[in-house]
Amino acid sequence: MLIRALPLCLALLLAATAQAQDNRQIAQGQRVWQQRCTECHTLDVDDTGPHHRGVFGRRAGSVKGYDYSRALRKANLVWDETSLDRWLTDPEKFIPGQNMDFRVRSKEERAALIAYLKSLSAPAAASPAAAQN
């Protein structure tokens, strides 16, 4: 009986370890966001930049009432891991004519920031970041 339970125990341990790593990355992303993004962005209210809650999966340039550059409004993309990584690496190279003059040079910080932004777009019950904000 013990031998039969071993694969299940290992699977549960691996899942718990992966979840803990995800939570650490989200927490790191929240710190990066607080340190580097809050000068222009908030989670829920448009400021110098548009609000960030729900950005993951949102069409670029689509927040009603926010004055986006023409380039971003016409970009025809949805924010996901790939587009956010390219955007945060070099916004002007990714979408020439956009208005954001900010980069996240560290690949690790970009990945953490993207994980945090993605967690903000998840249903509240499944989002560790939602409980912290």
Q: Could you say what each language-model-derived stretch is?
A:
Residues 1-3:
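N-terminal secretory signal peptides that target proteins for export/translocation
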Residues 53-59:
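Short cysteine/histidine-rich metal-coordination sites, predominantly Zn2+-binding motifs
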Residues 27, 31, 46, 78, ...:
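Soluble non-cytosolic domains of exported or imported proteins
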Residues 5-15:
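Bacterial N-terminal signal peptides
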Residues 23-45, 52:
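Sequence/structural segment immediately N-terminal to covalent heme-attachment motifs in c-type
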Residues 14-33, 130-133:
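Electrostatic cytochrome c docking/interface patches
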Residues 65-85:
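Short Fe-S-cluster ligation motifs
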Residues 80-128:
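C-terminal capping alpha-helices of c-type cytochrome domains
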